[in-house]
UniProtKB/Swiss-Prot annotation:
Matches recorded under Gene3D superfamilies: Herpesvirus alkaline exonuclease, N-terminal domain
Subcellular location, record wording: Host nucleus; Host cytoplasm
Biological source species: Epstein-Barr virus (strain GD1)
Disulphides: none
GO molecular function, one term: DNA binding
Main enzyme class: hydrolase
Any one cellular-component term (Gene Ontology): host cell nucleus
The protein's Enzyme Commission number: 3.1.-.-
Assembly, per entry: Forms a complex with the DNA polymerase, the DNA polymerase processivity factor, and the major DNA binding protein.
Family to which the UniProt record says this protein belongs: Belongs to the herpesviridae alkaline nuclease family.
Name of this chain's protein: Shutoff alkaline exonuclease
Keyword terms: Decay of host mRNAs by virus, Early protein, Endonuclease, Eukaryotic host gene expression shutoff by virus, Exonuclease, Host cytoplasm, Host gene expression shutoff by virus, Host mRNA suppression by virus, Host nucleus, Host-virus interaction, Hydrolase, Nuclease, RNA-binding
């Protein structure tokens, strides 16, 4: 690896130092040739992170990751520091608990997500939660060449809307729904400590603790994945087709008025699917409640090849979502609170990308709980997972200039007015998780084998059949 002092532009060198470039570097190829067996994941991921952090610490001063790696290395080969071989074997012998500490360092260094330079670099060679479904379907063709993160979003578009409103939804969940529970709302990139090929970034997690710069997840931790629905954004105007149905929901919050509100647009976000039928992939919320069956749509039967979908549907059909209808600040002196709660039979669609997104979050946070001392003996170490659907309206001249969530939490003047929040628990069967991760890991391995001369093994524990790895 080139000395950072010899480079004309150290920052440019660092931003291009991806996992793929590391695997192709002469130093790595020479080191691999001298091993008596192919290198393995996740040790190779941690070796790469050590090399990257060595560069970063030259101008960031952050030495925690490299210092911890050095404590795992048995011998120092030279005055310049341990060799790649010594680092690799130290990391290969590391326990899952020690690997979780390393991943916690990475998470703490990458907070800020898309605004954090290191967060962007680390996506290379990682199957992220947003890429899991496409990897299963099409292979990891973009995993080693991820598209650059764009922060230049049109203000009036759905991406900018979601980014703008996300903090408001976090405030509603933390303050109004969970009652000021201990929460963390700023996460870095969380790499799976046990395999090094999966990674996630969380929106919000409650019932977490802090240990210095680290976040400690516990067996009480609850993940909230936030979705702000741009297609339901409406104005307080008789000419807006959504407004009359919202008015009915606000005046009388109940299942019937909510059904009318959801179906006030051409492509509703909730799909009715009777038992034994296959949902479409169109949107991420389903129901089996006959009250939602407003039009006759033929659906295919669940059959061969739909085992994972059937298992996931069976696990989630009994889920009860909770709808929180918010008060109108124009009628309440600017205060936005919870007006009413309505339980509804709405659950996640296991054919949609968001199901796989929360599946991977569940898996990785569970790893952190198990290997960082956050779980109590005899208790399930798995976190709870919810997907949050938030609905907003545009501000009107009748709204006070200053609006608050609850009595004192100021709502940013640039943010639209929240009108309702739907919290949907997600159940993730173990068999579905195992099969999904096994398929994705096999796809990653096959792609890496065809792309790199020094492709590292994937941990055999990810596969249903250990013969999937050498």
């Amino acid at each position: 690896m080139a000395d950072v002092d010899e480079l004309e532009d150290p920052m440019e060198e660092m931003t291009s130092y991806t996992f793929a470039r590391f695997l192709r570097s002469p130093e790595t190829e020479a080191f691999v040739r001298n091993l008596d067996r192919p290198p393995q994941m996740p040790a190779m991921r941690y070796v790469y992170l050590y090399c990257l952090c060595k560069q970063i610490q030259e101008f960031s001063g952050e030495t925690g990751f490299c210092d911890f790696v050095s404590s795992l290395v048995q011998e120092n080969d030279s005055q310049d520091g341990p060799s790649l071989k010594s680092i690799y074997w130290g990391l290969q012998e590391a326990t899952d608990e020690q690997r979780t500490v390393l991943c916690s360092y990475v998470e703490s260094m990458t907070r800020g997500q898309s605004e954090n330079l290191m967060w962007d670099i680390l996506r290379n060679g990682i199957i992220s939660s947003s890429k899991l479904l496409s990897t299963i379907k099409n292979g990891p063709t973009k995993v080693f060449e991820p598209a650059p993160i764009s922060t230049n979003h049109y203000f009036g578009g759905p991406v900018a809307f979601g980014l703008r409103c996300e903090d408001t939804v976090k405030d509603i969940v933390c303050k109004l729904i969970c009652g000021d529970a201990s929460a963390n709302r700023q996460f870095g990139f969380m790499i799976s400590p046990t395999d090094g090929i999966f990674g996630v970034s969380l929106d919000l997690c409650v019932n977490v603790e802090s240990q210095g710069d680290f976040i400690l997840f516990t067996d009480r931790s609850c993940i909230y994945e936030i979705k702000c629905r741009f297609k339901y954004l409406f104005s307080k105007s008789e000419f807006d087709p959504i407004y009359p149905s919202y008015t009915a929901l606000y005046k009388r919050p109940c299942k019937r008025s909510f059904i009318r509100f959801i179906n006030s647009i051409a492509r509703p976000t909730v799909e009715y699917v009777p038992d034994g039928r296959l949902p479409s992939e169109g949107d991420y919320l389903l129901t089996q409640d006959e009250a939602w069956n407003l039009k006759d749509v033929r659906k295919r039967k669940l059959g061969p090849g739909h085992d994972l979908v059937a298992d996931s549907l069976a696990a989630n059909r009994g889920v009860e979502s909770m709808l929180y209808v918010m008060t109108d600040p124009s009628e309440n002196a600017g205060r936005i609170g919870i007006k009413d709660r309505v339980p509804v039979n709405i659950f996640i669609n296991p054919r949609h990308n968001y199901f796989y997104q929360v599946l991977l979050q569940y898996k990785i946070v569970g790893d952190y709980v198990r290997h960082s001392g956050g779980g109590k003996p005899g208790r399930d170490c798995s976190p709870r997972v919810n997907i949050v659907t938030a609905f907003f309206r545009k501000r009107s001249p009748l709204d006070p200039a200053t609006c608050t969530l609850g009595s004192d939490l100021l709502l940013d003047a640039s943010v639209e007015i929240p009108v309702a929040v739907l919290v949907t628990p997600v159940v993730l069967p173990d068999s579905v998780i195992r099969k999904t991760l096994s398929t994705a890991a096999g796809s990653w391995k096959a792609y890496a084998d065809n792309t790199f001369d020094t492709a590292p093994w994937v941990p055999s524990g990810l596969f249903a059949d250990d013969e999937s790895t050498p």
